[in-house]
Amino acid sequence: WALPLGLLVGTLLALGSVAAVWSLAGWIGRSRSHAGRIESVAALGDAGTEAPIEVICAMPPSWGGHRPGQFVFVRFEGTEGAHPFTIASAPHALGNSPKGEPLLRLVIKPLGDYTRTLPQRLHAGQRVDIEGPYGRFDGKGSRRRQQVWVAAGVGVTPFLALLEARQPGLSTGRSDSTPAHMHYCTRDARRDPLLARLQALCAQAVPPVPLAVYSEAQGQRLTPQDLEAAPGPLDIWFCGPQGLGDALHEHARGPSPWRLHRESFVMR
């Protein structure tokens, strides 16, 4: 241990121990933690237990706001540890609660054991602990590249926030006005509870965002060639299941002039 290598190993072990204690004590992210309140909970659509829920959260004064496309770690009162969810609203889009608290929207789809229990366990007035925001899935790209947005299933949530930020009166900067094309993959367009809102946001955006919908129930599937219909080099922004993301990643490694930005669904 007296040798330089031993001193280095000892220092690294000490730093690792401190980091482990810091993590186990729950101090990571503490400066970004906010105790909010559920303002409302509502089921979207008529898909029964498979319907996503919209959770509106009222945030405390410590909340410093967010950028479109960011996510947060959420721990609902009486449930297990924190889970990541994308903020599905643009900054200031929902205004404030009657108490003057800033509001944000979460759209949660029942994809697993935990999320399937939330419709029965969440209610207005309940405490919610939110850590964040995190991430840079902001749709900012070069004006020399065509912006192409690709969403599948609940992966549409960051794009709802990006599109909401492009609505009249909410646009805040150069990145909001960069022309983009939207591609949305869904199991069944006829029963998709988020599609109507997506269509309205695309149509009313400034500038409008052309939307292509691929409904699996109608035999429609997205291919890389569909994305390459846009001329020139592409900035591809993708959020959705890992399989489709991997396919796009493999294609982006080829000769196509793609730059792929990908929001991961595998983080826990």
Regions flagged by a language model, labelled:
Residues 156-173:
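Histidine-anchored nucleotide/phosphate-binding helix
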Residues 141-145, 231-232:
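Short helix-loop-beta connector
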Residues 1-17, 113-120, 179-268:
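Reductase modules of NAD(P)H-dependent flavoproteins
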Residues 1-34, 166:
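Anionic-ligand-binding alpha/beta catalytic cores of soluble enzymes and soluble regulatory domains
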Residues 69, 155, 240-241:
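Short, conserved phosphate/pyrophosphate- and ester-handling motifs at nucleotide-, phospho-/glycolipid
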Residues 72-75, 123-124, 164-169, 197-201, ...:
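Short, solvent-exposed amphipathic alpha-helical segments in soluble enzyme
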Residues 22-129, 138, 147, 179, ...:
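Ferredoxin-reductase
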Residues 146-150, 235-237:
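Conserved beta-strand elements of the Class I
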